[in-house]
């Protein structure tokens, strides 16, 4: 929403209603979307698509879901010579990434940051010659503001990080024992099993830290998991740290410093153009029926057949499709439990130059709903901030007056001219934000989520071994599954 009071409509969870609503375009005064439909290279790819490798089916592979995992899997399958179709429920590709604009400035409403510790996405960025730019506030702030025991403190970053850094050293001390090889999550299975039932809050409360340190850590944990710390698995927090080479400065840089200069949509478009897949947008899948020879996919507008199907939808929406035969009990259980990621992310334009700041506040405090706010950049118009909250019920990020009030304890006197976010919980094709496992979900479900079921393969950032919940995890898993499908169908055709 912008200062003049225009606001986009909100969407419910009906998939057909969602497709017809203004929320898909998210077009409001001062706010514009960059929807990745089909670029010219991708259109050309559709026109040159080959026929299926065997009779009796319309396609070799159907990919359900056009996020980074689905698009990457489709690229791998199509480059193996397989006729591939992507069915995407939304009117755009991109999944839980969404490049948009706020007052003529590019913003990322979903997945944003990349780093060379994330080998899959970084390889793609280099391969396609994309550039990155920096977000200055989280990784390299000048001033830190934090809430502890419902009081606000402010100090130079070096001073604040002495307090926070010693708390992190204590919190992360077991990470290397649990995840010595972070891309092999079960390398130390017994050690992981021993701690996987703990929540991030459970572990924090038993540590010999001051209340101030625990309040800062609570903010950090909420920001990582995008929910209250008691809903987040302690093992998830350890995983991020392990993937960041067991180093806090590297972790700051890995999770919120570097972003693609031309937007995440530019990487997705490059991957699409490099494949040879057909795409059908605004095509929600309702049923998937597999038999001995093929898979039949029913949408709200038609029926398609293939030799294999890659289901590349978020875990929280897995159960919205009817499967015959039914999916394994583990997949059904995980889908009904849902992952924990469900918080708020928003961009806030303030009139003042507040400098390069970072704020911390525990998820449950009496002063502000924001667990963290940090500077994206400062320019002649003021400051663009990025804000997070653990709970969407606490703040409407598109309500300027509410956002301005929520910022006052942290940044007294700031005037908000625009505030903009996207509620991924209301989006029927995501029903949540980035994937964060709850206690016990890694050891109970991760391996089962990755397993093929007949002609059905499963892909997504939500089931990646490494940077789960990140663009890197989506590409990791999408590439692997695309290769698996190509190998499976080649073997089947060779034996026919």
UniProtKB/Swiss-Prot annotation:
It comes from the Bacteria. It holds the Pfam family Amino_oxidase. FAD binds at residues 69, 88, 96, 113, 285, 461, 471. GO terms for biological process: alkaloid metabolic process; nicotine catabolic process. Induction: Expression is up-regulated in the presence of nicotine. Its main location: periplasm. Homodimer. This is Pseudooxynicotine dehydrogenase. The gene is pnao.
């Amino acid at each position: 929403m912008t200062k003049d009071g225009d606001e986009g409509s909100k969407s419910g969870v009906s998939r057909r209603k969602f497709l017809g609503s203004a929320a898909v375009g998210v077009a409001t005064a001062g706010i514009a979307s960059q929807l990745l439909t089909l670029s010219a290279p991708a259109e050309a790819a559709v026109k040159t698509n080959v026929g299926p490798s065997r009779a009796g089916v319309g396609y070799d592979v159907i990919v359900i879901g056009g996020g980074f995992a689905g698009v990457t899997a489709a690229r791998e399958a199509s480059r193996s010579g397989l006729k591939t179709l992507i069915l995407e429920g939304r009117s755009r590709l991109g999944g839980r990434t969404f490049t948009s604009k706020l007052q003529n400035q590019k913003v990322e409403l979903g997945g944003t940051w990349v780093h060379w510790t994330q080998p899959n996405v970084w390889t793609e960025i280099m391969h396609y010659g994309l550039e990155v730019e920096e977000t200055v506030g989280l990784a390299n702030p000048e001033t830190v503001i934090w809430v502890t025991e419902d009081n606000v403190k402010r100090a130079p970053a070096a001073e604040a990080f002495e307090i926070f850094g010693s708390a992190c050293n204590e919190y992360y001390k077991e990470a290397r024992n649990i995840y010595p090889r972070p891309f092999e999550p079960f390398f130390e299975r017994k050690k992981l099993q021993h701690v996987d039932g703990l929540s991030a809050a459970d572990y924090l409360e038993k540590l010999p830290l001051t209340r101030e340190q625990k309040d800062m850590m609570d903010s950090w944990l909420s920001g990582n998991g995008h929910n209250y710390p008691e809903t987040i698995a302690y093992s998830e927090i350890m995983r991020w740290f392990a993937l960041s080479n067991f180093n806090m400065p590297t972790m700051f840089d890995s999770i919120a410093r570097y972003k693609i200069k031309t937007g995440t949509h530019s990487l997705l478009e490059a991957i699409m153009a490099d494949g040879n897949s057909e795409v059908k947008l605004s095509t929600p899948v309702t049923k998937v029926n597999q038999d001995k020879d093929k898979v039949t996919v029913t949408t709200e507008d038609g029926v398609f057949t293939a030799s294999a199907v890659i289901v590349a939808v978020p875990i929280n929406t897995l159960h919205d499709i009817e499967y015959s035969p039914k999916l394994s009990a583990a997949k059904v259980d995980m889908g009904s439990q849902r992952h924990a990621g469900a918080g708020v992310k928003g961009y806030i334009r303030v009139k003042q130059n507040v400098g390069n700041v970072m704020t911390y506040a525990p998820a449950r405090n009496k002063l502000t709903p924001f667990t963290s706010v940090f500077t994206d950049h400062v320019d002649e118009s003021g400051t663009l901030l990025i804000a997070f909250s653990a709970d969407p019920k606490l703040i409407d990020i598109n309500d300027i007056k509410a956002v301005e009030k929520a910022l006052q304890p942290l940044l007294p006197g700031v005037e908000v001219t625009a505030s903009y976010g996207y509620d991924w919980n209301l989006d029927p094709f995501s029903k949540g934000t980035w994937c964060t496992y709850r206690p016990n979900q890694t050891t109970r479900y991760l391996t089962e989520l990755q397993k093929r079921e007949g002609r059905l393969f499963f892909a997504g950032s939500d089931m990646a071994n490494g940077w789960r919940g990140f663009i890197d995890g989506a590409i990791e898993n999408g590439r692997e599954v695309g290769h698996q499908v190509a190998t499976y169908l080649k073997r089947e055709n060779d034996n026919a």
